[in-house]
Amino acid sequence: MHKNFLCLKDCSADELNYLLRRAIKLKSRFKAGESYRPFEGKVLAMLFEKASTRTRVSFEAGMAQLGGTAVYLNTAETQLKNKESIEDTARAISRMVDLVMIRTGLHSRLEAFAKESKVPVINGLTNDSHPCQVMGDIMTFIEKRSSIEGAVVTWIGDANNVLYSWLSAASVLGFKVHISAPPGYSINPTQVPNNDDCYDFFLSPEEAAEGADLVTTDNWRSCGYDENQAKRQSKSARWQVNETVMKAAKPDALFMHCLPAFRGQEVSADVIDGPQSVVWDEAENRLHFQKALMEYLLLGKIEDI
């Protein structure tokens, strides 16, 4: 049976560590100008029910760099617009392509598609998780600090899909997540790992950041939330990552943001544009991690690493 990549909690530490090592290797080879095109004749279908910049470009570019082709589909241009079921969509598309990436809202739609698909399915984002983003982030941390095992990652802001993937990764890979969220915007207990040793809660952003190796956040307009944005931003104002928060972290702490960012809201300009910020390396590494992931799903482990 083919593998899917839907949620980090479904992966083993061996699998994730292999993918991270392989992504770093593929990036190195790409930067050296080496041509590596194992996907000649392979096709990736990219199904978008949510808008995207980085997800689309990174998957499309990654497939091209590996010698394959990517086909872009959105809801408005498919029969999903006319209420064709996600199951029937999966049954049809998966007979025509080698791999499918889906960016959607309800995680259950992703799971329903994967259940009927004849080819591997990748989670490009749901309201519950964003595994490719977090694995690209972890790859970036490893490049800068060699290992994430035992590290402290601080999340500042409301609990969302990216945080849930951080928690799953922490449970599998052995690091700790410190969380500080506005009242009413903390985690949903049904969406966190059973291993509660991998995270702690703090009332203030500064307390959460104390001793952190990495501070990360997301914008206050997170995918999947349609409530009044003014109310959300008002409640979140105290949870901005700024110079005060970063000073509470370790002196060499990194700052990450999954983007898009809104300077002056969830993060101050002096932090995201400052020397501790690695957001552009982080954005680039989505490309390289996803190349390693697609290679693994289509070809299995490659041992020249």
Residue ranges of predicted features:
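Glycine-rich phosphate/diphosphate-binding loop of Rossmann-like nucleotide-binding domains
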Residues: 49-61, 143-217
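Phosphate/diphosphate ligand-binding glycine-rich loop within oxidoreductases
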Residues: 38-142, 263
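A short, aliphatic-rich alpha-helical micro-motif
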Residues: 94, 114, 148, 208-210, ...
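Positively charged, low-complexity intrinsically disordered leader regions
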Residues: 1-57, 61
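Adenosine-phosphate binding glycine-rich loop
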Residues: 252-253, 258-305
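Rossmann-like adenosine-cofactor binding region
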Residues: 193-270
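Short, structured coil segments at secondary-structure junctions
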Residues: 66, 96, 116-117, 173, ...
